[in-house]
């Protein structure tokens, strides 16, 4: 099969260049890219006026299968990814059973082969994500796990986390840390501050995140292993990561779109789709996160896509589960809130959604080099539409961005040379 993407502006994160090129794909691989490539017999995709970038990678999603298929399945979650412009997703292990052994990792891999995009499983750090004993890391790596995390739960035992970093380091893998001190966050439902006091809701202090970020940076520094800080939300965390990088600590970090767009004031209407963990923080925290994105302290933009059923979220704020969906709004939020606002250049934004997550996970993606898998996202910077959850491919509708006009949207998603989404419609 041959496909020619013609007339687009190629954003190349490896070369660090943006230039008009045609991209020629043969049998699922990138054959070549250059000016005015003419190839007889190829299907032509006109990308004039659009950005052609390596397939976007979301390294933090919750696909909910096995065990929570009412919220999402690998089938629906990968379709949501395709509609959102993502060609690869890495799914967290907080399923039922927990993905803490090779058998569950193999099941997710097998189901992922039938999905619309590439699926990379992340294995649990501890058995059952209970934080008591290490899971079988070697078996999970052999089965296809690309990283280890107890996301949704912190590893409270510092000695256990130290051993996890040591073992992961020996395997050449990264540990993704959900930084939350449960002794500080216990019972909290939103950011601790003026708004939580006004609403009468128990708060989660910034220190609940920051003390664990500091701990895991120290453990990574001592062991020489790699740690990736998930969903950074506070100014203090950004500062700690920036200082650690300056010392040469092998730490990387990600931020979710809701943490660079929304503050705790979004909770004023008691909309349970604003209930996330870590919580929406103060305006100062949002500004610090944006600064961390701009100066390279934060390496990756990842959604923390966390679908829930309408019934689960349609309860009092205190009782609702944490989480919001993000796969189908991420690109629009990045382009509207960061690129159009001048926080990031288009190239910087693409690097944080392609090359950097690929490098953190150690997967052969995020490039448009000849011979690479033909995973490509085409973004139309002029395309705009309001967020309409009724059009989501995800089972989850729990978004606080309902009705928000976003400009700069994925126009086509190509996985292995096959167009899986075009004109906002999944094929």
Curated annotation (Swiss-Prot):
Zn(2+) 1 binds at residues 60, 62, 151, 304. Substrate binds at residues 62-64, 94, 277, 308, 322-323. One of its GO terms (molecular function) is zinc ion binding. It holds the Pfam family Amidohydro_1. GO terms for cellular component: cytoplasm. The active site is at 304. Keywords: Hydrolase, Metal-binding, Pyrimidine biosynthesis, Zinc. Zn(2+) 2 binds at residues 151, 178, 231. Transmembrane segments: none annotated. Binds 2 Zn(2+) ions per subunit. It catalyses: (S)-dihydroorotate + H2O = N-carbamoyl-L-aspartate + H(+). Pathway: Pyrimidine metabolism; UMP biosynthesis via de novo pathway; (S)-dihydroorotate from bicarbonate: step 3/3. GO terms for biological process: 'de novo' UMP biosynthetic process; purine nucleobase catabolic process. Its cofactor is Zn(2+). Catalyzes the reversible cyclization of carbamoyl aspartate to dihydroorotate. Belongs to the metallo-dependent hydrolases superfamily. DHOase family. Class I DHOase subfamily. This is Dihydroorotase.
């Amino acid at each position: 099969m041959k496909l020619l993407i013609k007339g687009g502006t190629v954003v190349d994160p490896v070369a660090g260049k943006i230039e008009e090129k045609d991209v020629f794909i043969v049998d699922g691989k990138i054959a070549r890219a250059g000016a005015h490539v003419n190839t007889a017999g190829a299907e032509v995709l006109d990308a004039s006026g659009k950005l052609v970038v390596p397939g976007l990678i979301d390294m933090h999603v919750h696909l909910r299968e096995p065990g929570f298929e009412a919220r999402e399945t690998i089938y629906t979650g990968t379709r949501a990814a395709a509609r959102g412009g993502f060609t690869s997703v890495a799914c967290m292990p907080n399923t039922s059973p927990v993905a803490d052994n090779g058998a569950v990792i193999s099941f997710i891999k097998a189901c992922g082969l039938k999905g619309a995009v590439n699926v990379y499983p992340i294995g649990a750090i501890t058995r059952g994500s209970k934080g008591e004993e290490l899971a079988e890391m070697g078996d999970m790596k052999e089965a296809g796990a690309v990283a280890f995390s107890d996301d949704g739960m912190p590893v409270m035992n510092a000695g256990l986390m130290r051993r996890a970093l040591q073992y992961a380091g020996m395997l050449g893998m990264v540990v993704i840390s959900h930084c939350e001190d449960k002794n500080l966050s216990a019972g909290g439902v939103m950011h601790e501050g003026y708004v939580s006091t006004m609403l009468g809701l128990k708060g989660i202090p910034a220190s609940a995140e920051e003390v664990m970020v500091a701990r895991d940076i120290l453990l990574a520094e001592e062991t020489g292993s790699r740690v990736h800080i998930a969903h950074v939300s506070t100014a203090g965390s950004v500062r700690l990561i920036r200082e650690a990088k300056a010392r040469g600590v092998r730490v990387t970090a990600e931020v979710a779109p809701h943490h660079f767009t929304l503050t705790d004031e979004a909770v004023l209407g008691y909309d349970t789709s604003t209930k996330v963990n870590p919580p929406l923080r103060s305006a100062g925290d949002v500004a610090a996160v944006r600064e961390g994105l701009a100066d390279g302290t934060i390496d990756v933009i990842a959604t923390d896509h966390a679908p829930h059923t309408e019934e689960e979220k349609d309860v009092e704020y205190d009782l609702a589960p944490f989480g919001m969906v993000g796969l189908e709004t991420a690109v629009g939020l990045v382009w509207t809130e960061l690129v159009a606002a001048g926080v990031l250049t288009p190239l910087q934004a693409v690097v944080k959604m392609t090359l950097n997550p690929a490098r953190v996970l150690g997967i052969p993606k995020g490039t448009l080099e000849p011979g690479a898998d033909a995973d490509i996202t085409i973004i139309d910077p002029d395309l705009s539409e309001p967020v309409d959850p009724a059009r989501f491919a995800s089972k989850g509708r729990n978004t606080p961005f309902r009705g928000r006009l976003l400009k700069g949207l994925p126009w086509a998603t190509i996985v292995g040379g096959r167009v899986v989404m075009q004109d906002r419609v999944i094929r």
